[in-house]
């Protein structure tokens, strides 16, 4: 059994008479301290913070004056002292605590203002290991945890963004903090130190190249609360972490309504897909609905790529997401606004394009400043009942694979180009996934089926339907190529591709019936390439 608590009444309003300020980020601290001073609050501070406040003309007592002990070991030890921690932890209504505080000359601290050494920023800056270690804050987290534990009497502020929040409370209660406020600040404080320690543990694991540490932590700060989740009866919020990856999380919303839960999920899927296409080599557009592509294409211009992608399935594209690997231009913007679109995401957008999009006030336009690197590693997490599944990001790129021609006929140059295009796309389609492609554009996509043959049939059928809507007399799958996200367990999927008129196929290989599938390809004159890499997506 743990420590048994003694019970004392907790005051609702507690006056702030004494504050300790020790901040790494000095933003706003002078104005905050000045406001506290106006309430006759005694100011105690440390090192650099004390100097900043003194330079501003504020009466500040250095922590060394309180403890009677100087900062030592390059500032590693300055607040780790009974006169500080006793002041933070003392239970004012406990007679034994009161006696101890009086005996040792401990005067309670009613408010702690601390933000920590910038560990994450330093660890991501390319600094050497010793510099990173020096930016692990010790005294700060110790004080934060102490003050938060004793929130019955002590408020704790860990974020610059909370300064105005606290000052409004002090104004409302004439220099006092309410218990509900102190409790809320305590919750934020523990979340802050937990995230800080998680970042340190993550850095150690990465530095030691431990891919599966014994304890894995995920943390983020609240960016915004959404109206609802996937469905109106579900609550949702977005928490931001410190990953520096271009995408929806770091994008600027130039216009339109706030992004919904589904918008963010779909937009992330769209931008990750279009990032498979190197903007230095090609121009590409992806159209996404429910996190699945309904059309992807390359073109000589964004307009051409967009129209080719739209041709794949213009019905499903209605109300979807448009992702571009190049800055949105005027010509493409004029085409996009012709149908209802939820979100456009691109590295940037020209002034003329922005003016066109502004005609649709609810259309969301996001710019990211760049594309995510599809080769970059990272973790992907999925929550389960009672746990979290964690895996590395699928960062295999078709350009880096050793493609093996396994049939008698090798793909032509045009077929190989389309095969690689299709394999880029199929990586981002929910399994089981089949993609038909022709002339650097998808013409049919089959997604999320329990059997591969069904995905193949659906992809061909959707291509036929799109051709009929466009008034075409021949199915676009004639002369197309096919990509599969996983191997064909039987030859039936390949035969469905033959029936649709495909001439070449790309797949991972690895089935116990590979020879049967290869023989079927040879019998029908198909060229087939094995990649050796599977792209399941769930």
Curated annotation (Swiss-Prot):
Its catalytic activity?
(6R)-10-formyltetrahydrofolate + 5-amino-1-(5-phospho-beta-D-ribosyl)imidazole-4-carboxamide = 5-formamido-1-(5-phospho-D-ribosyl)imidazole-4-carboxamide + (6S)-5,6,7,8-tetrahydrofolate; IMP + H2O = 5-formamido-1-(5-phospho-D-ribosyl)imidazole-4-carboxamide
CDD domains of this UniProt entry? Answer: IMPCH (cd01421)
* Its EC number(s): 2.1.2.3, 3.5.4.10
What are the protein's UniProt keywords? Hydrolase, Multifunctional enzyme, Purine biosynthesis, Transferase
Q: What is this protein called?
A: Bifunctional purine biosynthesis protein PurH
What are the disulfide bonds?
Answer: none
Record family assignment: Belongs to the PurH family.
Family matches, as HAMAP family = PurH
Read off the PANTHER family from this record: BIFUNCTIONAL PURINE BIOSYNTHESIS PROTEIN ATIC (PTHR11692:SF0), BIFUNCTIONAL PURINE BIOSYNTHESIS PROTEIN PURH (PTHR11692)
What pathway does the UniProt record associate with this protein?
Purine metabolism; IMP biosynthesis via de novo pathway; 5-formamido-1-(5-phospho-D-ribosyl)imidazole-4-carboxamide from 5-amino-1-(5-phospho-D-ribosyl)imidazole-4-carboxamide (10-formyl THF route): step 1/1; Purine metabolism; IMP biosynthesis via de novo pathway; IMP from 5-formamido-1-(5-phospho-D-ribosyl)imidazole-4-carboxamide: step 1/1
GO annotation (BP), single: 'de novo' IMP biosynthetic process
> Residues in domain MGS-like?
8-158
**Entry remark concerning the domains of this protein:** The IMP cyclohydrolase activity resides in the N-terminal region.
- What InterPro entries does its record include? AICAR_Tfase_dup_dom_sf, Cytidine_deaminase-like, MGS-like_dom, MGS-like_dom_sf, PurH-like
Give Gene Ontology CC terms: cytosol
GO MF annotation, one: IMP cyclohydrolase activity
Q: Is this entry keyworded Protein biosynthesis?
A: no
Top-rank taxon, per record: Bacteria
